[in-house]
Amino acid sequence: MDKLIITGGARLDGEIRISGAKNSALPILAATLLCDGPVTVANLPHLHDITTMIELFGRMGIEPVIDEKLSVEIDPRTIKTLIAPYELVKTMRASILVLGPMVARFGEAEVALPGGCAIGSRPVDLHIRGLEAMGATIDVEGGYIKAKAPEGGLRGANFFFDTVSVTGTENIMMAAALANGRSVLQNAAREPEVVDLANFLIAMGANITGAGTDTITVDGVKRLHPATYKVMPDRIETGTYLVAAAVTGGRVKVKDTDPTILEAVLEKLREAGAEITTGEDWIELNMHGKRPKAVNVRTAPYPAFPTDMQAQFISLNAIAEGTGAVIETIFENRFMHVYELHRMGAKIQVEGNTAIVTGTEKLKGAPVMATDLRASASLVISALIAEGDTLIDRIYHIDRGYECIEEKLQMLGAKIRRVPG
């Protein structure tokens, strides 16, 4: 397994381009299955999960055409099997997203129960209950979800999500696009990635209103037509590089991004002492060499502070002036990175769903291990400011969510290199 070696102490300075959002690209790729012709999706990030999703299509008999800029053309009319096999699905939770489109378009689906990051219990029961409300019959047996649409296809339904679920909202919204009649999704997720998926479906001819609010209305149509669509920028990648610059007292300009989908994070960075300027598709952060001030953070569904930025702000607080509380309300067991940061000298106490972080002027390089995607980003950030070398193991977690992380950090002046395991 590859490792990263980071020598701390370099102040980040420069410009980088932000990649397309993985959490938008994956549902959009799944949604191409709803179309009755070829669809082109552009601005895909070069990430393992994206490759896995494209490989899954290949296993189903679809042959995606990929160009060197990683835009992909998919023609779902060539599909030969409606099974998403375990060996592919086990590595990627987002594979559950093909369930709704396949049942809606082809009348049946068989999808292995998914794998992915080990964060708390992330049940798929909302997906199943939503499809059942639309008339599907579903059995879970042998580790597979087997779903069948009723005679005449899925029916529009009113469905209330007990808990806000991004992938649940996406799956049911996709299925509803081709259902007979109107579906109303209540307590729906409001994330920008849900809006991006809705915009893609609309580009193919779907009739959807309310995306970005907690009530989404979908009037089913008979068919979705070919379209070309560009995936939105990755707001979590954007935020991660801004925090990295803030921690090192540096300056960074991130381009090809969207400041309007990151307001809660930018607000906290300003609170930490960063000077932030924005344009239509760029954000610049400048710390002017100063040490950040500790901030209190509480994660909550969009538009509040995102859970996927929690770990990065623990790293910021770890070297900040003062003490900050980080409260995690979305996932359980999402403080695994704290025990690795302790090895670097961070002063963090975890009490239930709260981490109390007392800033220290210096962290020390140490061998550490990535436990999940965002936790690994926090280790990279802390390593940038630590004295000496930090060796980060199990970085395949990082590669699941960050495109070319070492190249981008090198462009900003970081001393970072990848070594084969």
From Swiss-Prot:
Pfam families tied to this protein: EPSP_synthase
Pathway recorded for this protein: Cell wall biogenesis; peptidoglycan biosynthesis
Residues annotated for UDP-N-acetyl-alpha-D-glucosamine binding in this entry: 93, 122-126, 308, 330
The organism's place on the tree of life at top rank: Bacteria
GO process annotations (BP): cell division; cell wall organization; peptidoglycan biosynthetic process; regulation of cell shape; UDP-N-acetylgalactosamine biosynthetic process
Subcellular location: Cytoplasm
One CC-aspect GO term: cytoplasm
Leader sequence segment: none
InterPro entries from the UniProt entry: Enolpyruvate_Tfrase_dom (IPR001986), Enolpyruvate_Tfrase_sf (IPR036968), MurA_subfamily (IPR050068), RNA3'P_cycl/enolpyr_Trfase_a/b (IPR013792), UDP_GlcNAc_COvinyl_MurA (IPR005750)
Family assignment from sequence similarity: Belongs to the EPSP synthase family. MurA subfamily.
Keyword set, alphabetical order: Cell cycle, Cell division, Cell shape, Cell wall biogenesis/degradation, Cytoplasm, Peptidoglycan synthesis, Pyruvate, Transferase
Modified sites of kind 2-(S-cysteinyl)pyruvic acid O-phosphothioketal: 117
EC number: 2.5.1.7
Name of the encoding gene: murA
Gene Ontology molecular function: UDP-N-acetylglucosamine 1-carboxyvinyltransferase activity
Record's protein name: UDP-N-acetylglucosamine 1-carboxyvinyltransferase
UniProt KW Cell division keyword: yes
Free-text function comment from the UniProt entry: Cell wall formation. Adds enolpyruvyl to UDP-N-acetylglucosamine.
Active-site residues (renumbered): 117
Chemical reaction(s) catalysed: phosphoenolpyruvate + UDP-N-acetyl-alpha-D-glucosamine = UDP-N-acetyl-3-O-(1-carboxyvinyl)-alpha-D-glucosamine + phosphate
Binding site for phosphoenolpyruvate: 22-23
